[in-house]
Amino acid sequence: MARPSRILTLIVSALIFNALHAQDTLFARQTICTLASPAMYGRGMQHRGDSIAADFLRKELAAYGLKPLAKNYFQYFRFPRTTTRPPIVQAGYRSQNVCAYLPGKSDSMIVFTAHYEHLGMHGDTIFYGAHDNASGTAAVLDLARALSTQKRHYTYVFLFFGGEEAGLVGSSFFSDIPLIKLDKVKLLVNLDLFCGGDEGLMVVNAHDERTSPYVDLLESINDEHRFAAKIARRKNAPNSDHYPFTSLCPAVFIYTLGGRYGGYHSPLDRCEDCGLEHYSNFNTLLHTFLNRLEK
């Protein structure tokens, strides 16, 4: 029979674990609801919603003590062409990537990315973009927040891209004019579409010889702990901000499979419809993965 002290320790540990998970999910929910609120105007060009969102991210990163990769954390770029459907953007419109880092003992880097902008507005209709991609942005911001309190071997870089919906504009600009040495990147992980997840996680560009060992590690961790229903793999595709980097460094894109989220690329992609039932498990999976890489 287990001793009472042992039972008490297990109970306390379980309570602490559950409390930490609840805090992670609460942070993600609050961040998603902030980014997908009417005050952000769909994070597009209209009313400069993208700049309002970028300023929110800049303030959060500064509060966590992350260092800027560019002045005021912003790398500015301009859109090359006018679009006629959401996201409605005028050629020459200036937007920004939000770029920060946590220095480690090594100059070898692990990079997390997410696109923070969305489709903006069409007439008076707001495209809120909770799933796409306030959710991935919140997950990357949560990682930055947690890692800022820890001493790490690797340098961690956090990039929040603009212009993804108009054709990977911000990430392509960064890959062309990088603020870091891309040959020092050990792995780049892009998070996009991170609500739901009843059916697990998909890893894009998982079959590349440079990325497959990392996906193997992620899968083995999940086999041990069952953080996700499954880890699925697919070949590379130009469907998110990892793509401009795939010829320059090991880069993958992770998104959720199944579960609850609002309408894709519609005004119904709202905060209240973003299911976060699996968020804490996915967050713990990523932290466990990083801890294994650090060994």
Regions found by a protein language model. Name each.
Residues C33-A36, V98-C99, M109-T113, V157-F160, ...:
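Structural recognition of the beta-strand scaffold that forms the well-ordered cores
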Residues F27-T34, R48-A63, N72, S135-D142, ...:
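Extracytoplasmic/secreted proteins, especially bacterial periplasmic and envelope-associated proteins
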Residues M1-T25:
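Bacterial Sec-dependent N-terminal signal peptides
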Residues P38-R48, P86-V89, D124-N133, F160-F161, ...:
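Second-shell loop/turn segments in exported
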